[in-house]
């Protein structure tokens, strides 16, 4: 009886110590203020592709992404900073196995590299996003499945590709579009101001932001669009030319096709 009591006390002490470590990690980074859904334009990102591999969606030929794809759903602070790697939670792909078709289509890796994990190793693109950002999304999310499922649903509900297409902004290696017009199209569709990130004059990412209850809100980085720190006054949505040289036009899908 005494030995059993000692064992129970030992287990309790170990559990308490582990819980204390987790609490301390969470306390070191305060709770986030809002979410940023970051979307990548493959025509810009894939232009830097020099090597192909099976996991790189830029190398899928006619099956390569033809619309904005998900980079991540990021907990952010109102001061422009963000938490990261809030607690240790090793990524387990089997937890999201039922979401794999949607993830491969809408949240693919656009690189052959293996991103670093919060634990010092290398892993998958999805694993990186969960460990760096998903672990900081508490108290909204506590598990991988709901984090990835909600991100997919937000992406499908806020179809930026279709919004731009309807406004006349289509993929082109020759056309330049007014940054203000692109921002206005998104404002009219979702009643918020996005953040736009460019590589030189090409749109690289567009970010749509949400309160913790997933109601849309302005992004912090959108508050000074007139400075155009990242993007010039006129921007492009480049087409992607695969490595084999065969031009592949990134066609804008309709809302029905995106679903």
UniProtKB/Swiss-Prot annotation:
It catalyses: a ribonucleotidyl-ribonucleotide-RNA + H2O = a 3'-end 3'-phospho-ribonucleotide-RNA + a 5'-end dephospho-ribonucleoside-RNA + H(+). Most highly expressed in flowers, but also expressed in roots, stems, and leaves. GO terms for biological process: negative regulation of autophagy; rRNA catabolic process. Keywords: Disulfide bond, Endonuclease, Hydrolase, Lyase, Nuclease, Signal, Stress response. GO terms for cellular component: endoplasmic reticulum; ER body; plant-type vacuole; vacuole. CDD domains: RNase_T2_euk. Residues 1-19 form the signal peptide. Induction: By phosphate starvation. It comes from the Eukaryota. Coiled coil: none annotated. SUPFAM superfamilies: Ribonuclease Rh-like (SSF55895). The keyword Phosphoprotein does not apply. Belongs to the RNase T2 family. May remobilize phosphate, particularly when cells senesce or when phosphate becomes limiting. This is Ribonuclease 2.
């Amino acid at each position: 009886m005494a030995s059993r009591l000692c064992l129970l006390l030992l287990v309790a002490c170990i559990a308490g110590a582990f819980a204390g470590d987790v609490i301390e990690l969470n306390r070191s980074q305060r709770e986030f203020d809002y979410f940023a859904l970051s979307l990548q334009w493959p025509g810009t990102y894939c232009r830097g592709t020099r090597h192909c591999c099976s996991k790189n969606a830029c190398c899928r030929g006619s099956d390569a992404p033809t619309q904005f794809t998900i980079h991540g759903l990021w907990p952010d602070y109102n001061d422009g900073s963000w938490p990261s790697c809030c607690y240790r939670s090793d990524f387990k792909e089997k937890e999201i196995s039922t979401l794999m078709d949607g993830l491969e289509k809408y949240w693919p890796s656009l690189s052959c590299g293996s991103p670093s994990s919060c634990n010092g190793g290398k892993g998958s693109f999805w694993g990186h996003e969960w460990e760096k950002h998903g672990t900081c999304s508490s108290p909204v999310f506590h598990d991988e499945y709901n984090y990835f499922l909600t991100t997919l649903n937000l992406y499908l509900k806020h179809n930026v590709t279709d919004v731009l297409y309807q406004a006349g902004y289509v993929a082109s290696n020759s056309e330049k579009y007014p940054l203000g017009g692109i921002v206005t199209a998104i404002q009219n569709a979702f009643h918020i101001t996005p953040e736009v990130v460019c590589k030189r004059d090409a749109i690289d990412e567009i970010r749509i932001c949400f309160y913790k209850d997933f109601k849309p809100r302005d992004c912090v980085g959108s508050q000074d669009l007139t400075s155009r720190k990242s993007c010039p006054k006129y921007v492009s949505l480049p087409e992607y030319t695969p490595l084999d040289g065969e031009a592949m036009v990134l066609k804008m899908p309709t809302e029905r096709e995106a679903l």
